[in-house]
């Protein structure tokens, strides 16, 4: 509300909240920092887990930053920007989500200190942008080229990604699976590799132990054969993939057939049977002994398929059909009548097996399959879910190295190198931007500090030791949280793709756009929200003051 000649002028509707200038910046920075503090304790191999309970009572236990923020019902718009940081990091690099969010939170904390010194947000943003650009150059210079055929390097990177998660005890076994899965689906394009993660299917089944998790060089489908009289095992499988129903098509128009005698009814039924039989005969004629159908299969068609010794599975998901095509070399056919022997795929074995009391179809022994399945096992639902998250991270990390061929030491080593080098760069810049660049360098130290703190070590003492060792021995020195001392992380096998820290800097820098906001205008809640309807509250300041 403004005043004009002593008269109040109402611009915004009643109930609207508005925060201006430093208040807006303070509230936004505080909201973002709360998000960073929430996930901070999960960082590193000694990080803690979070238990998240939704409104239905479903529980998620994890220390995966992206999962934690995804499961939380966050309302504040600035806090949502931090969630986007984690999502971007997960999408682009596959790991380092917590690192990106923690760095973003620390950059904002340092920015707030600069704002308190009356340094303009534009100067801070410019300084941070210069520092981030320099950080990318430094990461490129310290990255090591590796042979993407070196399975040992890939395995170490996968083990680093799994360490600290619930599946840690079996990390070597799971890392081997992750490496094999990526190598199997990697395709060479020119002189580089490309990995499409959609070709790696994760299938979860409770029961057994984590050690029972296995990689199937083919596809596992959570279905069963359509007819009890069908074969449950086919060796030397010739596989047909059909994405239409093996049923008599209903007309699209509202047509009526008037039947006046039993003979006409019999002829009608016989024609239906003939049409179904022709479909099945065509499948048999081309030499298929296994058929996967995306839609339904008529009871009569099931009978004939069983009679001819053809194994059939119906209502297979489109994504599974595509994976079957890539694994077996089959072509997906829309019309059965167009099926030819060239459209068939091959597998050494197609078999229905019981897993945890439920039937599943295993398609195995494919020649050079470009789609694979990881069947994840574990004692409880929570264990299976966490193993899946660990394997997803491991697979993405291996993918990054296979595609880029570059690694860096992990364990806080790159962040310490960046902090030291960016701080030296600040002296070259001068002006008020120098203060922002120095703040950026100081903010990066939050990673080694947090790694040490989460391991029960003294953060300051550990940081001083590590920086001293780093300056003396080089950019691969980081925090060994198990020994509680500085160590060469490359020698210890603690490595990460260079894409992870590079993307973390990019993602964190995006959150700095929060500093540009000097006015927050939040509309009042809708009436239906007041009555208990679903909708997010807009009272942003109340929880943050």
From Swiss-Prot:
GO molecular function: ATP binding; ATP hydrolysis activity; ATP-dependent protein folding chaperone; unfolded protein binding
Origin: domain of life: Archaea
Keywords: ATP-binding, Chaperone, Nucleotide-binding
Self-association and partners: Forms a Heterooligomeric complex of two stacked eight-membered rings.
Protein name in UniProt: Thermosome subunit beta
Gene from which this protein is expressed: thsB
Function: Molecular chaperone; binds unfolded polypeptides in vitro, and has a weak ATPase activity.
Family stated for the protein in its record: Belongs to the TCP-1 chaperonin family.
InterPro entries according to UniProt: Chaperone_TCP-1, Chaperonin_TCP-1_CS, Cpn60/GroEL/TCP-1, GroEL-like_apical_dom_sf, GROEL-like_equatorial_sf, TCP-1-like_intermed_sf, TCP-1_chaperonin, thermosome_alpha
Disulfide bonds: none
């Amino acid at each position: 509300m403004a005043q004009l000649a002593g008269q109040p002028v109402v611009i915004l509707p009643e109930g609207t909240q508005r925060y201006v200038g430093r208040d807006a910046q303070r509230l936004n920075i505080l909201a973002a920092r709360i998000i960073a503090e929430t996930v901070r304790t999960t960082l590193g191999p000694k990080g803690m887990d979070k238990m998240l309970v939704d409104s239905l009572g479903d529980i998620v236990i994890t220390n995966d930053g992206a999962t934690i923020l995804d499961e939380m019902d966050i309302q504040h718009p600035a806090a949502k920007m931090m969630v986007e940081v984690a999502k971007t990091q997960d999408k682009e690099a596959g790991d380092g989500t917590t690192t990106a969010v923690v760095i973003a939170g620390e950059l904002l904390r340092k920015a707030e200190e600069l704002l308190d010194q009356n340094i303009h947000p534009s100067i801070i943003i410019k300084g941070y942008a210069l520092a981030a650009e320099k950080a990318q150059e430094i990461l490129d210079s310290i990255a090591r080229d590796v042979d993407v055929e070196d399975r040992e390097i890939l395995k170490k990177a996968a083990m680093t990604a799994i360490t600290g998660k619930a599946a840690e005890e079996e990390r070597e076994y799971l890392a081997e699976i992750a490496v094999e899965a990526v190598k199997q689906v990697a395709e060479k394009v020119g002189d580089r590799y490309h990995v499409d993660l959609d070709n790696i299917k994760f299938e979860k089944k409770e029961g057994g132990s984590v050690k029972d998790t296995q990689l199937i060089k083919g596809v596992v489908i959570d279905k069963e054969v359509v007819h009890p009289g069908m074969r449950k095992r086919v060796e030397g499988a010739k596989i047909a993939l059909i994405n239409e129903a093996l049923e008599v098509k209903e007309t699209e128009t509202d047509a009526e057939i008037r039947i006046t005698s039993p003979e006409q009814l019999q002829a009608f039924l016989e024609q239906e049977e003939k049409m179904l039989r022709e479909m099945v005969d065509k499948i048999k004629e081309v030499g298929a002994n296994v058929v996967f159908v995306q839609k339904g299969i008529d009871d009569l068609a099931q009978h004939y398929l069983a009679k001819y010794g053809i194994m059939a599975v119906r209502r297979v998901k489109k994504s599974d059909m595509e994976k079957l095509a890539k694994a077996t070399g089959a072509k997906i056919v829309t019309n059965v009548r167009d099926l030819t022997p060239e459209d068939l795929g091959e597998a050494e074995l197609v078999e229905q097996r019981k897993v945890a009391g439920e039937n599943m179809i295993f398609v195995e022994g494919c020649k050079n399959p470009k789609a694979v399945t990881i069947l994840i096992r574990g004692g409880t639902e929570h264990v299976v879910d966490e193993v899946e998250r660990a394997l997803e991270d491991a697979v993405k990390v291996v993918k990054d190295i296979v595609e880029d061929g570059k690694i860096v030491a992990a364990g806080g080593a790159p962040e310490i190198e960046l902090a030291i080098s960016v701080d030296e760069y600040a002296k070259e810049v001068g002006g008020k931007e120098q203060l922002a660049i120095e703040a950026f360098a100081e903010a990066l130290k939050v990673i080694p500090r947090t790694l040490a703190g989460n391991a029960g070590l003294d953060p300051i003492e550990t940081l001083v030791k590590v920086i001293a060792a780093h300056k003396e021995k080089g950019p691969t020195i980081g925090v060994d949280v198990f020994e509680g001392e500085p160590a060469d992380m490359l020698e210890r096998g603690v490595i990460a793709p260079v894409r992870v820290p590079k993307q973390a800097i990019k993602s964190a820098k995006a959150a700095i756009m929060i500093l540009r906001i000097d006015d927050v205008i939040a509309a009042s809640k809708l009436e239906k929200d007041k009555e208990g309807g679903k909708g997010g509250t807009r009272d942003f300041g109340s929880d943050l003051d």
